[in-house]
């Protein structure tokens, strides 16, 4: 689109490729090759371009303002690699140096200047992956995500984080070995503190240089795709860093943030909230995420802190009701609908995932029916309930068995993703393994049971790094994972267990083919409170099934009986208590032939030994003839 159309659509909130208009761009004007610079600062008294090519303040270049509040200038002084900023004079007369909000490259800390660099055109080799992704989608495919903080998965001997060139060599083989389908990174956009988690951003188009270069991340994504691994990145469109040299009060007045002081300030996080109803902000944010999807070939976006965008009273600070007297933030609601509409029109096969904890808004519902249009929502209720249950002494579990079963009441009210994320292994919450009840042996048994339950429960899966091998200490963002734990036999066996469990998940269609309706699950018994045993069936469209049985008590149950719908010889295909994974069983249960006899609504029974704190999964090995009628369900 030409410059006039780019400017018009920016002001109407319809420019979703803003990086082609604002920022620095190499152009030829009147026979001179140079760079055009454009920045939105509608209420600034003046804006000057300064940088290496002006000797900074000595020869700063004045910029001209157009009718939409965009300041621009063309100059042939800059060269590739030069650093620049905008010197913005506010209405008060104060001058302040600001970053270029559209910069793709920022200088290394402690500086925050933008770097003039021509974005190279990558010749991608992942066409087959993208074609398969488009053909298959993801709703009826396995999705098992390994969540990673790029700065602390592994570190160099000098304590510096791995670059993505290093992660390409180490992390991708690990993902393949561990049989994950996707990897999700905490924010990779530029943020002020390199050792932070990255959720207060300053550069929405810039790659965080702590982790290397944009080109290195492109190569990482490509290599993931060549190894059949999808890549998801966290994105924060609700709030941004309060740092003076970034987006905050860019021209001296509320520019990217709300006009109202209390709405603009996120008191709980010490950040500023985007004015999601402002057209220019919508163009900026949607352009940001489209750029990341297009430039890096991302397979999914996890939108952080959605509740903060939906509810006026989400923060701990003062708030004012909306025009209807309620707490709904209509600007945030409509922005998220529009965001998903735009992304889905361009990339229907890219996952849009919401981190959202309330039940007051339909997050994954159809936009036409009032939903927000996300593909998945984190199931925070399930996660909180299930962790509380597994931390509890088994003596009391029968009184709280509803913590395990309650999710079946609402499991398909949204398209859920089941997260054991970074948020659950910090700030004194203990690591996932350390949360488990009992001594060291029982903690590992509990963790094997828990991860198997997550894999069998309807919904896509996410596990934060370190939990796969039972790291004992909490996650520390300034240190690498406790890889030395793997010198311990129990941790090494736990790692092998998780890798095998992930492969089992991928190889068994009943666990993922029907994740969005009750057609994919049938409860056998959710009422065995006294023994703390839960059993259900996962199914495919063709009727293939897995019988999943979970013993949440440290008591081995011999001659344990459940009902099954089909007369058959059944074989145990999964047992969490095998010796090779740290348990005490030397081998699986023997195959068992079902017996005729009514058990609840089931015409057949299956009797076997259920391991203590164990999970046992069975499948049909061979059907047999029976006079009994099939289960009426």
Curated annotation (Swiss-Prot):
Keywords: Carbohydrate metabolism, Glycogen biosynthesis, Glycogen metabolism, Glycosyltransferase, Transferase. Pathway: Glycan biosynthesis; glycogen biosynthesis. GO terms for molecular function: 1,4-alpha-glucan branching enzyme activity; cation binding; hydrolase activity, hydrolyzing O-glycosyl compounds. It catalyses: Transfers a segment of a (1->4)-alpha-D-glucan chain to a primary hydroxy group in a similar glucan chain. Signal peptide: none annotated. The active site is at residues 304, 355. It comes from the Bacteria. InterPro entries: A-amylase/branching_C, Branching_enzy, GlgB, GlgB_N_E_set_prok, Glyco_hydro_13_cat_dom, Glyco_hydro_13_N, Glyco_hydro_b, Glycoside_hydrolase_SF. The keyword Glycosyltransferase applies. GO terms for biological process: glycogen biosynthetic process. Its EC number is 2.4.1.18. GO terms for cellular component: cytosol. Monomer. NCBIfam families: branching_enzym, PRK05402.1, PRK12313.1. Belongs to the glycosyl hydrolase 13 family. GlgB subfamily. Catalyzes the formation of the alpha-1,6-glucosidic linkages in glycogen by scission of a 1,4-alpha-linked oligosaccharide from growing alpha-1,4-glucan chains and the subsequent attachment of the oligosaccharide to the alpha-1,6 position. This is 1,4-alpha-glucan branching enzyme GlgB. It comes from Streptococcus gordonii (strain Challis / ATCC 35105 / BCRC 15272 / CH1 / DL1 / V288). The gene is glgB.
């Amino acid at each position: 689109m030409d410059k006039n159309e780019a400017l018009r659509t920016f002001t109407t909130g319809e420019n979703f490729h803003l990086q082609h208009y604002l920022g620095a761009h190499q152009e030829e004007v009147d026979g001179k090759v140079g760079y055009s610079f454009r920045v939105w600062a509608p209420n600034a008294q003046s804006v000057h371009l300064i940088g290496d090519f002006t000797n900074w303040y000595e020869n700063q270049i004045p910029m001209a303002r157009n009718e939409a509040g965009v300041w621009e200038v063309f100059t042939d002084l800059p060269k590739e690699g030069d650093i620049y900023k905008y010197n913005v004079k506010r209405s008060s007369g104060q001058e302040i140096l600001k970053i270029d909000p559209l910069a793709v490259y920022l200088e290394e800390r402690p500086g925050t200047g933008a770097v003039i660099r021509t974005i190279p055109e990558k010749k991608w080799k992942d066409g087959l992956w993208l074609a398969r992704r488009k053909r298959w989608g993801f709703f009826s495919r396995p999705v098992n995500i390994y969540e990673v903080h790029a700065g602390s998965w592994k570190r160099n001997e000098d304590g510096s984080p791995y670059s993505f060139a290093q992660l390409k060599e180490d992390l991708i083989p690990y993902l393949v070995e561990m049989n994950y389908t996707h990897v999700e990174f905490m924010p990779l956009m530029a943020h002020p503190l390199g050792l932070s988690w990255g959720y207060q951003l300053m550069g929405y188009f810039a790659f965080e240089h702590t982790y290397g270069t944009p080109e290195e991340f492109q190569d990482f994504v490509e290599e993931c795709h060549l190894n059949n691994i999808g890549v998801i990145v966290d994105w924060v469109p609700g709030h941004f860093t309060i740092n003076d040299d970034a987006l905050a009060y860019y021209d001296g007045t509320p520019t990217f943030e709300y006009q109202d002081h209390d709405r603009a300030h996120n008191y709980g996080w010490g950040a500023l909230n985007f004015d999601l109803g402002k057209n220019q902000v919508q163009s900026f944010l949607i352009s940001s995420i489209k750029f990341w999807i297009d430039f890096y070939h991302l397979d999914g976006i996890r939108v952080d802190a959605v509740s903060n965008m939906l509810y006026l009273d989400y923060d701990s600070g003062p708030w004012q009701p909306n025009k209807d007297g309620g707490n709904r933030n209509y600007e945030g609601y409509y922005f998220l609908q529009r965001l998903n509409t735009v992304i889905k029109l361009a990339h229907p096969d890219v996952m849009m995932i919401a981190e959202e904890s309330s039940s007051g808004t339909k997050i994954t519902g159809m936009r036409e029916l009032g939903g927000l249009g996300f593909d998945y929502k984190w199931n925070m209720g399930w996660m909180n309930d299930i962790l509380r249950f597994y931390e509890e002494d088994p003596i009391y579990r029968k009184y709280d068995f509803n913590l395990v079963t309650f999710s079946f009441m609402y499991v398909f009210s949204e398209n859920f993703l089941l997260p054991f994320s970074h948020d659950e292994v910090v700030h004194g919450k203990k690591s996932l393994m350390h949360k488990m009840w009992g001594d060291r042996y029982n903690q590992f048994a509990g963790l094997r049971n828990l991860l198997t339950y997550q894999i069998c429960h309807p919904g896509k899966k996410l596990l934060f790094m370190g939990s796969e091998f039972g790291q004992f200490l909490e996650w520390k963002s300034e240190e690498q994972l406790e890889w030395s734990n793997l010198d311990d036999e129990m941790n090494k066996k736990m790692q092998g267990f998780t890798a095998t469990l992930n492969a089992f998940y991928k190889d068994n269609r009943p666990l993922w083919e029907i994740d969005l309706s009750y057609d994919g699950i049938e409860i056998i018994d959710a009422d065995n409170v006294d023994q703390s045993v839960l059993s259900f069936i996962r199914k495919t469209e063709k009727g293939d099934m897995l019988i999943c049985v979970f013993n949440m008590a440290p008591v081995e149950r011999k001659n344990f009986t459940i009902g099954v719908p089909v007369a058959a010889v059944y074989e145990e295909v999964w047992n969490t208590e095998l010796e090779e994974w740290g348990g005490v069983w030397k081998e699986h249960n023997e195959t068992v032939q079902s017996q005729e006899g009514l058990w609840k609504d089931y015409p057949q029974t299956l009797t076997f030994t259920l391991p203590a704190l164990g999970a046992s999964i069975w499948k049909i090995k061979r059907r047999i003839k029976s006079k009994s009628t099939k289960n009426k369900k």
